[in-house]
Amino acid sequence: MADTDLFMECEEEELEPWQKISDVIEDSVVEDYNSVDKTTSVSVSQQPVSAPVPIAAHASVAGHLSTSTTVSNSGAQNSDSTKKTLVTLIANNNAGNTLVQQGGQPLILTQNPAPGLGTMVTQPVLRPVQVMQNANHVTSSPVASQPIFITTQGFPVRNVRPVQNAMNQVGIVLNVQQGQTVRPITLVPAPGTQFVKPTVGVPQVFSQMTPVRPGSTMPVRPTTNTFTTVIPATLTIRSTVPQSQSQQTKSTPSTSTTPTATQPTSLGQLAGQPPGQSNQTSNPKLAPSFPSPPAVSIASFVTVKRPGVTGENSNEVAKLVNTLNTVPSLGQSPGPVVVSNNSSAQRTSGPESSVKVTSSIPVFDLQDGGRKICPRCNAQFRVTEALRGHMCYCCPEMVEYQKKGKSLDAEPSVPSAAKPSSPEKTAPVTSTPSSTPIPALSPPTKVPEPNENAGDAVQTKLIMLVDDFYYGRDGGKAAQLTSFPKVATSFRCPHCTKRLKNNIRFMNHMKHHVELDQQNGEVDGHTICQHCYRQFSTPFQLQCHLENVHSPYESTTKCKICEWAFESEPLFLQHMKDTHKPGEMPYVCQVCQYRSSLYSEVDVHFRMIHEDTRHLLCPYCLKVFKNGNAFQQHYMRHQKRNVYHCNKCRLQFLFAKDKIEHKLQHHKTFRKPKQLEGLKPGTKVTIRASRGQPRTVPVSSNDAPSGTLQEAAALTSTDPLPVFLYPPVQRNIQKRAVRKMSVMGRQTCLECSFEIPDFPNHFPTYVHCSLCRYSTCCSRAYANHMINNHVPRKSPKYLALFKNSVSGIKLACTSCTFATSVGDAMAKHLVFNPSHRSSNILPRGLSWMSHLRPGQASERVFDWSMKNTYLPPPLVPNKAATVKPVGVTPAEPQELAGPVLQALPSPASTATPPATPTHPQPSALPPSATEGTECLNVSEQEEGSPVTQDPEPASGGGGGSGVGKKEQLSVKKLRVVLFALCCNTEQAAEHFRNPQRRIRRWLRRFQASQGENLEGKYLSFEAEEKLAEWVLIQREQQLPVNEETLFQKATKIGRSLEGGFKISYEWAVRFMLRHHLTPHARRAVAHTLPKHVAENAGLFIEFVQRQIHNQDLPLSMIVAIDEISLFLDTEVLSSDDRKENALQTVGTGEPWCDVVLAILADGTVLPTLVFFRGQANRFANVPDSILLEAKDSGYSDDEIMELWSTRVWKKHTACQHSKSMLVMDCHRTHLSEEVLALLSASSTLPAVVPAGCSSKIQPLDVCIKRTVKNFLHKKWKEQAREMADAACDSDVLLQLVLVWLGEVLGVIGDSPELVQRSFLVASVLPGPDGNVNSPTRNADMQEELIASLEEQLKLNGEQSEEHSASAPRPRSSPEETVEPESLHQLFEGESETESFYGFEEADLDLMEI
């Protein structure tokens, strides 16, 4: 037994109510969970020992007789009937076998050392026993068995020597210590197998057998240490019947699938009878007759309970032992007889016989006729809910079929009598009122092959890790909250009066104040853990805690619930057993009831799901507030010393009642682990802290003979049996099917990419990873999965066992356009998209693929017969690598370009792939992160070469050698294209020093290759929509969307929704194009928004148009307002170069100035308000259409809205005596109480545009706002070139900006029709016919408006290039289509070697990049 194992047992009391097989649960059976704290597991093997024991001569009982005798203990009685000593023995026999065979197996039970038991007593009398016998003719049998001795106090067995018959040996001598409760034991030996069946009751404790004489040994394995981490106890008995006898029958009687604990108890009836009372029935007609199966050696099934008396009943114990030696019913019987404290007589026969039991005690079936069975694995369930939950995991496709028309209740149950394969194998069954047919445990549709079911009698075992058993998470109502639009609420800090834009920033700001106090010395923070907020006595203890608990490396001795580390795994397991419950989730989000066993998951959940809401989360006790002042006061009170820490988790509370309520409500099992759902009671569950094999406890030669050592080793080696999803019969069928596949020739495994020389060895069985949802039949793929994903080490030690990928093979999903060459990537895609049924195998890189019609390639399956005649060359090594789990993403382009270009060779130097594929080191990422291709690793991978080059046919000649290289862009080019999509083509050209036409050409090439090369939808559809919504919201707030921020957000969403995914530039470019996220799209109103964003937009349009109609609002009272923030980099402005980059419209800090634009639905442009951070005394030339406000400290969002309402809006509404409507976004502080009060005072109805919808339904975003920003950019760049060497400060720049704003506002003000049509395009106003225009019509209008305004502002030349970049042209100019490879061939082919040597590699690199 390993010190790192924790044995659990799936018992009836621990199951959910719908999982219980029996509908009636007696109160006396229910146990306290804490009653398993002091138990141990003992594994015992019957071995020959050098001590003889005389075996009593058994009397023969002949004739047809059925007897039932009940004798209860006549000693001192205890009020608790469950503590009385009661032994129930039931034996049934048939006409062909004896009730007692020669050399039977007696069971000797003692409680105190009787005086007469110095040597084995042969003829005592049994008092507390009930015997049910059904004997027929007595015949002799050569089968011998072993006696079993169970004692409670030092039972002295002397002169224990083998008898003359070598087959009759001592079986077991167990010693139960005084004062300990005894768990009922069920012993079921079967030929050549092991059987373990503890029943429901109190735990059992066995101690080491104390020898009477020095040197004598007992076959009981001693405990090697005093620390035990195993519960509850199990007892394993092995039979010593020769294999020649056990093989006489093909099917071994077994009751492993029928739990004894679920049978109705009859113990109360037996124990309640007066002492000595007997009930005899001698009607020979009730004796059934059974066929004669071959004789097997079995042991009687005995339930022993601890009596309430000790020394004075030693005579009774002696009588008990003597009677056990004389009662004939203790001999052999043709089938195992089960007797326990809560079950009646049961008899199980093999599939080839039918059984009838006659008894005066009620007899129950092993399973009733109402059971439901799984149609795939034949697992049996009593209630439909349990079967449905099992089928959702076992056979989900059948569940879908059931939902379409067939009910689960119509599932056929197990037949009571299976159809026989031959008439000789089934005996006639006489139906009587007292007989109950016992159906076969599995339908005997096919006789199993020899030795295939050798291990079927082994009891069900399940091996689980601590993470699976104790930890879990529950989604709560988080999914329901995602449909509601998020509205950011600003909070003002009471310490520094700073206003934070949303709740998460306010929470971080409060933590920052505490850190400042600690740095200033106001609060002692040298002994406070900044992760779990615990107080330590010394800094050294804090340092040890940080290294052991909060390090990034996984540890098998760290409790993730309470975040404590332990010295060893046994101590850790003991802590888990004593402190925590299975499925305990004490950390709860009070907003949506999301809960988890890990604090970090709840914290990440709140920051992601409840961002931009009014909720504030206390990091100390997870209490949620809606008021900023209350949150601040509560937060600061946690900094005091008098807080109440929970000793079962990391939370701390301000009041004792909160702590008590927390412990009562949350420190209990919230939901049982999914692996335990549907398990039968009695299943042995082994809990392990680590993933390694359990260590074998050595047994010295002085404690046990050599035979015992071998048996103990055999038992230990069979302990960690894997969990199979199919029953043994079905596994054997699968193995036979795999063996038949070997005749198909040599094949290649799609999972590990290796050839399959031997199918049975390569696909040994279907295994399921206990740590995740990974399942496979490939042994190499399973080993690689465990090495890469579940081996806790600080640095990668082993390379992956995968090859690069199968050459020429590609997998295409039959339900969508997803295609990949990595089998695991396709498996993950199918898992995350359950509606996608299957995938097809396609050849990749073949010349005829480009001539197939759309959809034709997905229907054609690759023929492996082509392998001998057509072999594609090996592929380029994978560009595999991904983001680190801590959130490290590729750096900014300017930081990466230098070292990457220096470290990477040129494209021409990597035209020939290496002969041996390189294997990338596995990173500490989720499984999907290390799979696939085309991901950037700037430290190892080649960025200049194409990511994947499609292989060309070997016989294709050299004419088309350059075609495949043009299919996909290199990583360098993809980075440039991604930059252009995040910003614009002009900025990308300036940043990477590439012509804009070349960037647009790369973009067109990438768009053209999308139809044939859809290699990477790495995120699910739901995750991509969430990421697209984030991009739209970032753009609305003028926050940066670049390579770094995009990859960081994608990683965060991928980890939270899917457990991780891989990142590549190709995926990023496709994502931006797939969701139309280019910043300067001219038909944005026709693009599809994410699902719930589009729903919010529809609700907004419906609300606005209904209010306009109901309130009869005039067009002059419908206003749209939006802000434009300008960011100034003063350092760049004062420098001599790059001055054009000083003024930006995207940034994260405080804006240099804010421009508030406002337009009316009748085409009027209201005065524009400009807020400048600084002094504006010298500015006298301010245009009439602009109002300037200046202050050194700047203006807050509330102040901006207040000044705009006072200086602009109230002046406009003063002469209008009508209600009005204000269209604005939900960002900044537009929804604060102050702003809403201002609007209410002016009778203005706020129409708030939902987050992410501004590009489609905000009138200013449709045309005007983007044009104003482009015009300012153009003017400043022209001015920066003119004053490159001249000095320029912010005051001069402000004067220029005011002039440019006046110019652009004048143009807009002269085009009232353009302004009015902006409201129509945004669907704020209905169309001329009263209905909303179609998206296509609105897109045409938007494109026309943008073109008209740009033409007036002379922006059409530059923006036409932008437009050409977003839409591919049908035919490009010859200058743009010329490639460096073609020029290289041209000059080298037509020039003399002496006169021209071709281009240098560096020149080619510059031409391409």
Curated annotation (Swiss-Prot):
GO BP: any one term: cell division
SUPFAM superfamilies linked: beta-beta-alpha zinc fingers, Homeodomain-like
Claim: Zinc-finger is one of the keywords in the record: yes
Keyword Ubl conjugation (UniProt): yes
Ranges of residues in domain DDE-1: 1113-1319
Transmembrane segments: none
Composition skew (Polar residues), residue ranges: 275-284, 345-356
Gene3D superfamilies: Classic Zinc Finger (3.30.160.60), Homeodomain-like (1.10.10.60)
Glycyl lysine isopeptide (Lys-Gly) (interchain with G-Cter in SUMO2), cross-linked positions: 319, 356, 419, 446, 486, 626, 674, 797, 879
Positions with biased composition (Pro residues): 914-925
Motif annotated as Integrase domain-binding motif (IBM), chain positions: 1379-1403
Keywords for the protein's UniProt record, in alphabetical order: Cell cycle, Cell division, Chromosome, Coiled coil, Cytoplasm, DNA damage, DNA recombination, DNA repair, DNA-binding, Isopeptide bond, Metal-binding, Nucleus, Phosphoprotein, Repeat, Ubl conjugation, Zinc, Zinc-finger
Subcellular location(s) per record: Nucleus; Chromosome; Cytoplasm
Annotated PANTHER family: POGO TRANSPOSABLE ELEMENT DERIVED WITH ZNF DOMAIN, ZINC FINGER PROTEIN
Protein name from the UniProt record: Pogo transposable element with ZNF domain
Species of provenance: Mus musculus
